[in-house]
Amino acid sequence: MAVSHLPTMVQESVTFKDVAILFTQEEWGQLSPAQRALYRDVMLENYSNLVSLGLLGPKPDTFSQLEKREVWMPEDTPGGFCLDWMTMPASKKSTVKAEIPEEELDQWTIKERFSSSSHWKCASLLEWQCGGQEISLQRVVLTHPNTPSQECDESGSTMSSSLHSDQSQGFQPSKNAFECSECGKVFSKSSTLNKHQKIHNEKNANQKIHIKEKRYECRECGKAFHQSTHLIHHQRIHTGEKPYECKECGKAFSVSSSLTYHQKIHTGEKPFECNLCGKAFIRNIHLAHHHRIHTGEKPFKCNICEKAFVCRAHLTKHQNIHSGEKPYKCNECGKAFNQSTSFLQHQRIHTGEKPFECNECGKAFRVNSSLTEHQRIHTGEKPYKCNECGKAFRDNSSFARHRKIHTGEKPYRCGLCEKAFRDQSALAQHQRIHTGEKPYTCNICEKAFSDHSALTQHKRIHTREKPYKCKICEKAFIRSTHLTQHQRIHTGEKPYKCNKCGKAFNQTANLIQHQRHHIGEK
């Protein structure tokens, strides 16, 4: 916040708000003694810098109080307040020497500030002489654009709005001007603007650390937020409130941005297209993340284990593994989750909601990724290909499991029998052999199963559903593995080879049966 050199000071010295941090009474009460001391030091430093440049009138009572370390609270008026001593008197004109960076010598800025409680505005007109180090500051009074003429309360003088255009005509920036969105400062080069903006970034970071505390805390899970609106959105996770409803399908959302995103599913709009592979996305941020697949960029790194990620959301999810934090708890079964999305997906188990429906066969799913994987059954798409053996897979999880066949990796070991598995779900399924647990029950015949996939396959006996169809002979199957085995009849593929005699088979069961002959020969 401190004024570092004159050009920045002139732009930021028209109203109190431009050089001060303002607090409401409630916000002031939330600050710790250390934060109030920081506030006082920053304000006094700003005032001292402005005094040294000769741009201020008599010292206001406010700063006398601050110097004496008296408790002070800014006035809380609807339109804010403007201090007369912060600007030059209309009759006075001064020339001030200043040290100006070389790259800024050919720049000038006109900056206007408005008082929200009045119809007139005051502007500081800054004339920056090219190649020199002299600055002329003149106070001018202009009328509100919506009124033909209005008297300024400070000087009593009246001007038409045309005066502004007349006086500022000679000060138009070049076509290649780059303006800072934070303070309005103009630069002739984008590289200079980027350097300048780092000052704001550092200031904003410091303000967040010292002043902008996360004051809005959720009573349910203790998570804190900078803004009350963010807390309100977060609390809807706990309450289940979804005030934004889609008129097309009736689906409801907790935030309006999610509804806007969802509506593009109905329209089919995907305006953001990858220029490398042509893949299109609903959101620009998704395209940015996708681009990193091509570039290999992973800018978000875990400071504990150094693992890197394509997007911040994946890093946040990963960091919860280290912290063990699971703030989202299901009121139905007590299960807790480290992500709100996982929590919402879990709740659909209890509600039975399956909002993602296949337009080919009508099958519905709880999560969109399951629908995407399912649709590949119809399209035959297998985007995940193994570099070792050339085998392709419909989903990434199956591909990841397959790769462990080549590496021999089995990191998940049973604590009861020491048997090892390639993935955690296989271990969980195996452990149910020891416990006898069968948590998945058929709602038609009440037969129970130890894993969900077995229940899904069983239900097809009742429904007679055969979703896996051969494209060559149209024969259909209940299981995808049965279709894969059947297709080898057409292709002649025999991937299972006997290591004793070299004979090959199209099914593992046939290979096992064959190997028994070798054992019998011995």
Swiss-Prot record:
May be involved in transcriptional regulation. It holds the Pfam family KRAB. It comes from Homo sapiens. GO terms for molecular function: DNA-binding transcription factor activity, RNA polymerase II-specific; RNA polymerase II cis-regulatory region sequence-specific DNA binding; sequence-specific double-stranded DNA binding; zinc ion binding. Belongs to the krueppel C2H2-type zinc-finger protein family. Residues 147-170 are annotated as: Disordered. It is found in: Nucleus. A zinc finger (C2H2-type) spans 178-200, 216-238, 244-266, 272-294, 300-322, 328-350, 356-378, 384-406, 412-434, 440-462, 468-490, 496-518. This is Zinc finger protein 454. Coiled coil: none annotated. Residues 14-84 form the KRAB domain. PROSITE patterns: KRAB, ZINC_FINGER_C2H2_1, ZINC_FINGER_C2H2_2.
